[in-house]
Structures are given as structure tokens and as C-alpha cells.
Design a protein with these regions (language model features):
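Hydrophobic, membrane-interfacing alpha helices
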Residues: 29-316
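Absolute N-terminal positional cue centered near the fourth residue
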Residues: 3-4, 22, 38, 301
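Low-acidity, Ser/Thr- and Arg-rich intrinsically disordered low-complexity segments
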Residues: 2-3, 12, 16-29
Length: 316
């Protein structure tokens, strides 16, 4: 066994240990002999303890996500001719939208029975539980309200904002990794990770798969924007973000291990799943609507928009 660095080691994990902590059916396909040196992740999610106060890696990552998102938003808004005051004002609406939307999304979609039994737990943010789909819904509503307040189209604001979300969301997945949450299914891949604070089963590092989606989507948005296919405000950038990001989320969700699946247990969703013959998890169901909305925005932009290069030629 190699020495631990920040709680990280690589060592053989006997299948019998996995059986003792994990689901036997989940690991039955593994050999009864030693596992091939998975990474063992056993990092304390608390970085610093100051008496009753704690500084957690997740909190730092959340702050970095907000800072990254605002920096990209501010740069884009200024580049397209809006004032600094306009960019800063959105901060006072956007941050609450992220927190409130993400928290309510988690409570409603993933653990409604817990929070209906004790509604005050909704405010217990330190216990964790923020859903990215709730964040997306909160930001969409906030962008609409902000656009009405400032007499600017919702699609224009969304085209400004989409790359900011794509580049910042990865920080949240880093925080999930430090918390040993949103873990993947049992796996025998060479890069499998044992989240020792959860169990001793080698698993897909699903948080890192999600982490890669954001920067990839950001690069796609830059490529689309640089091709001058349609002007900012057509909704093409926002539509591309919704389609690519949440489309990839549908793919990655299949590698996650799920412990709360209230949405898929509802009769309409359960019936569709039985008809299809394979499981569709809550995160996949929640990603379908953003993908459809993105495809609608792309189609609308391509039908009604004009090329940015054509506008430039007209201005000359």
C-alpha cells in the first residue's frame, strides 16, 4: 500500500470487505480475490475547524463557482455593450436564485417525504442537498424577471449567461468529490475510487464525469459563438448550452448510484420505465425538459435569426 496523501491511497481491496459494507448483488461480478489497486479516497470534508465554526471544501468550491460564474458573466456583459452596474445588479438576484432554487429542487425532487414531515429542514443548508436542476430552474426564472425589469429580451440575457454557468458548475462537482457524495455505481474500471467514508466498494467517480461536462460544454459554446452562426440574443447559445449540458447529464446519470428515487416511483414515470424496459433515474427525467427546451431555442434561432456576419456587413 502506498502512503496516504491528503487521505488518498492506492491499495488492493478484498471483495469480502466490499461485501461487508456494500450491496452483495452490486459487487457479485467482482473476483473473490483482491481488487486491482483502486484509489482510496478518505479525505475529511472539513478543511479547518475553528471552535464551533468549520470551513468545508464544499463551501470553498461553492464560493469559487459563484466567483467564476460572475467573472464570466461580467466580462461577457461588458463585451456586448452593457454597463458594469447592469452586470453587478444581477449578482443580487442570481446568488439567491442559485441557493433557493438548488435547495428547493433537492427537497422537492429527491427527498420530499423528509421535508414534508419537517419543513424547517429546508433551511438546514449545512446538512447539504442542492440540486443542479433546481439551480437551473431558479436561474431561468430570475433571468426572465431581470429581463422584464431592464427591458431586455430573455434570450439575450440567457446567451450572456450560459457560458458562465458552463464554466462554473464544475466547482460544485469538486465539492461533491470532497464530500464523498453523488458517488458512482460499483465498478471494476482502472480509475475506480473507493469512497472510504461511504463504504469500501470501488465505484465510478461520477462527480468527476460530471466535472468534465461543464468545460466541454463551455468549449462548444465558444466554438458556436466564434462561427458567427447567429447574433447574441437569438437564443442559440442558451439553446446549445441546454442541449449539450443536459444531454450529457442524461448519459452520465447512468453511472451514478442512487439512494433516493421518489420521482421515478410516481405512476406515470414508473409506467414509462416499465414500457421501455430499462431504468430511467430521477436526474435523467429532470434533464429531458431542458434538452427539449434547448432544441426548441436552437430551432427558433435558426429559423428566425440572421448571421452575425450579415449584420456586420450591413453596418459597414
Amino acid at each position: 500500500m502506498r502512503p496516504a496523501i491528503l487521505g488518498v491511497t492506492t491499495q488492493s481491496v478484498p471483495a469480502t470487505y466490499c461485501m461487508s459494507r456494500g450491496n452483495a448483488a452490486s459487487v457479485a461480478r467482482f473476483s473473490s480475490g483482491p481488487m486491482p489497486n483502486p484509489i482510496v479516497w478518505n479525505v475529511d470534508p472539513v478543511l479547518v475547524r475553528l471552535g464551533p465554526l468549520t470551513v468545508r471544501y464544499y463551501g470553498i468550491c461553492f464560493g469559487l463557482a459563484l466567483a467564476t460564474g460572475f467573472a464570466v458573466w461580467f466580462t461577457r456583459v461588458r463585451r456586448f455593450g452593457e454597463s458594469a452596474a447592469f452586470a453587478e445588479q444581477f449578482l443580487y438576484f442570481g446568488v439567491p436564485a442559485v441557493i433557493i432554487g438548488g435547495r428547493l429542487g433537492y427537497c422537492f425532487f429527491y427527498a420530499p417525504q423528509i421535508y414534508l414531515a419537517n419543513p424547517l429542514r429546508v433551511f438546514a443548508l449545512w446538512q447539504g442537498g442542492i440540486a443542479s436542476h433546481g439551480v437551473a430552474a431558479g436561474l431561468a426564472i430570475t433571468l426572465w424577471a431581470f429581463s422584464r425589469r431592464h427591458h431586455i429580451t430573455w434570450t439575450r440575457l440567457s446567451d450572456y449567461f450560459a457560458p458562465a454557468v458552463a464554466l462554473s458548475v464544475g466547482w460544485i462537482r469538486v465539492g461533491n468529490f470532497f464530500n464523498s457524495e453523488v458517488i458512482g455505481r460499483p465498478a471494476s474500471v482502472p480509475w475506480a475510487v473507493v469512497f472510504a467514508r461511504h463504504d469500501l466498494v470501488p465505484r465510478h467517480p461520477a462527480q468527476l464525469y460530471d466535472l468534465l461536462i461543464g468545460p466541454f460544454t463551455y468549449l462548444v459554446l465558444l466554438a458556436v459563438e466564434r462561427r458567427n452562426i447567429r447574433p447574441i440574443g437569438s437564443g442559440l447559445i442558451a439553446g446549445t448550452f441546454l442541449t449539450v449540458y443536459f444531454g450529457l447529464r442524461i448519459f452520465v446519470e447512468q453511472y451514478k448510484d442512487f439512494y433516493v428515487e421518489q420521482l421515478r416511483e410516481m405512476p406515470p414515470f414508473r409506467s414509462i420505465e416499465q414500457w421501455l424496459g430499462f431504468p430511467i433515474h430521477t436526474g435523467q427525467w429532470l434533464s429531458v425538459l431542458p434538452v427539449l427546451a434547448g432544441m426548441f431555442l436552437i430551432g427558433r434561432a435558426m429559423r428566425s435569426g440572421v448571421r452575425l456576419s450579415e449584420i456586420a456587413r450591413t453596418n459597414h
